[in-house]
A protein has these predicted regions:
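Conserved donor-binding loop and adjoining core beta-sheet/short helix segment
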Residues: 2-61, 156-172, 177-178
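Conserved acetyl-CoA-binding loop-helix of GNAT-fold acetyltransferases
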Residues: 46-53, 172, 176-178, 182-199, ...
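Conserved hydrophobic beta-strand within the GNAT/NAT acetyltransferase core sheet
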Residues: 171, 203-208
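Short amphipathic alpha-helix that is part of the acyltransferase structural core
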Residues: 1-9, 80-84, 88-131
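Acyl-donor-binding surface of acyltransferase catalytic domains
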Residues: 31, 35-100, 105, 208, ...
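A conserved beta-strand-loop-helix scaffold within acyl/acetyltransferase catalytic domains
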Residues: 127-175
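Conserved active-site tyrosine of GNAT-family acetyltransferases
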Residues: 72, 215-217, 221
Length: 234
């Protein structure tokens, strides 16, 4: 199946098809999820019809596999998104970290949804509330996990797997507090989670923006596929 898309779309549709701000559409050859102003597409459709539909929906970006899905007419590629996962050899060695700092941190594998949301979206209360609701809904059904590193009860690093579905674990929202970046704690946490998910029989996958490709390659993750993010021509 398609990495990321085959985890995210079916799970979100099953849990949120009657919920705002999600909208889902399925045609004979296309599955489409709208979340906020971003569309996720799997399959293919007529490019002119797709452009009209996305415009009608107020969509500002679309993530798709342009090897199989022609982009909407009048849209341009904004960036290539790399899909990463574990290499065929299996689990990754834990990367180097500032050991003195690491020993001060507490790993929480059942992190508070409210605290994860606040750490990720401190200035956006609406996004914070949406994220909190989504995480609680998924986690109560065993479909998501969120980990944090905490220092004196403050969340300083987090990563999660926010769609456990169809044998995949879609990892996202890795973030380290600004003062502690560059010390290796984010990379260590991401590798630990990916290895843990793999030992549970899941296939960890995640999408990576161009500026982060070197970081994940250095950690030892393998490129599995490429998707593209398209935006309307202004």
């Amino acid at each position: 199946g398609l990495p990321v898309l085959d985890a995210l779309l079916p799970l979100d549709c099953a849990l949120f098809r009657k919920s705002q701000p999600w909208r889902f559409y399925a045609g004979p050859t296309l599955a489409l999820e709208l979340s906020g102003s971003t569309a996720w597409l799997a399959g293919h459709a007529n490019p002119a019809e797709l452009a009209g539909f996305l415009s009608f929906c107020g969509c500002e970006s679309a993530i798709l596999d342009d090897a199989t899905c022609s982009p909407p007419d009048g849209w341009r590629k904004a960036e290539t998104l790399t899909v990463f996962g574990l290499p065929q050899a299996g689990l990754l060695p834990l990367p180097a970290v500032d050991e003195a700092l690491w020993t001060q941190l507490t790993l929480c594998r059942e992190a508070s949804a409210a605290r994860v949301a606040a750490a990720l979206y401190p200035a956006d209360l609406t996004r914070q509330a949406d994220f909190y609701s989504e995480l609680c809904t998924k986690r109560s059904r065993g479909r998501a996990v969120a980990w944090t590193l905490e220092q004196e009860s403050a969340v300083v690093c987090t990563v999660g797997a926010y769609a456990l579905c169809n044998g995949q674990a879609y990892m996202a929202c890795g973030q380290t507090a600004e003062p502690l970046r560059g010390k290796g704690i984010g990379g260590r946490l991401i590798v630990e989670m990916a290895n843990s998910l793999a030992t549970e029989g899941l296939r960890p996958v995640f999408l990576c923006a161009p500026e982060r490709v070197r970081f994940y390659t250095r950690l030892g993750f393998a490129k599995l596929a490429e998707y593209a993010r398209y935006v309307p021509e202004k």
